[in-house]
Amino acid sequence: MKFSIGLRWEEWEADYSDSLQESFNPTDKMSGGKISLIKSMTNGTNMYASLAKGYKQGGFNLGLGLDANSTNQNLAYDPEFLTNYELGINTKLLDSKINFNGVLFYSNREDQQVLISTQTDPSDPNTFSFLTQNAAEGVNHGLEINMDMDINQSLSAFVNLGILKTEIKNWQSRQDLEGRAQAHAPERSYALGLNWAPTSHTYLAIDFTGKSSFYYSDSHNNKSKSYVLTNLNLGYVKNNWNYELWARNIFDEYYSVRGFYFGNEAPNFIDTLYERHGDPRHIGVSIRYDF
């Protein structure tokens, strides 16, 4: 059995002043570290348990167009701290034809940094912007599984699966969002694919990646739809050169990756959802030389 420990300490200082006469000098002292136990079995299986604490420093929201009545409550945000617990396993099955990795995790986020949208003038869409604030607490837990399989000498496959549950907790300024999932945290994500190499110079690869629906933002309750993308690669390799014909999103799936909710259309400037969509089908050629 192996035991490892790591520690980190940081002191962060900053100076802020602007044309609205806001001026302050925040100082944050942050610490983190990791403790892990690793058990190696005789059959090549490794199991581990870890406890880690990390942090993300605070900062400022710039370019918000805030008026003179605004306070530094909107301008500055505090550090976020994360405590993470993990149990994991790595093993090889069927005479090393399958490589399996699995992780169970639970994370507690304190002073969670959340990205929200604001519009200082409801009748002026040019005042729409994003800012970071602190929610009191957030919780993440889930499962990750990765498998690589050698089916035969020329055919291999992979499967990646993620299950994630998240929750916003104890957010005093937005109690309506307490208990809701965090933004951009789909409950299910996956990828699977096949790689076929009929000769030492040629290969064909196809993969499918998908996500379930997720909330666009921590400032409104609009969600994306689930989607699956299909990608294809056809390649030729010789003398350190790699020639590849590829296609991304070959079925031209229409899907959204971001969502913005604000008033933009006169005369009433009613809050409306505007979505940014992912890349459509695109095809290309790549040439690479490996030294």
Regions inferred by a protein language model and the residue ranges of each:
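Residue-level signature of outer-membrane beta-barrel architecture
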Residues: 1, 29, 37-40, 53, ...
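Transmembrane beta-strands of outer-membrane beta-barrel pores
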Residues: 9-15, 51-57, 64-66, 93, ...
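Gram-negative outer-membrane beta-barrel transporters
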Residues: 11, 106-108, 127, 131-218, ...
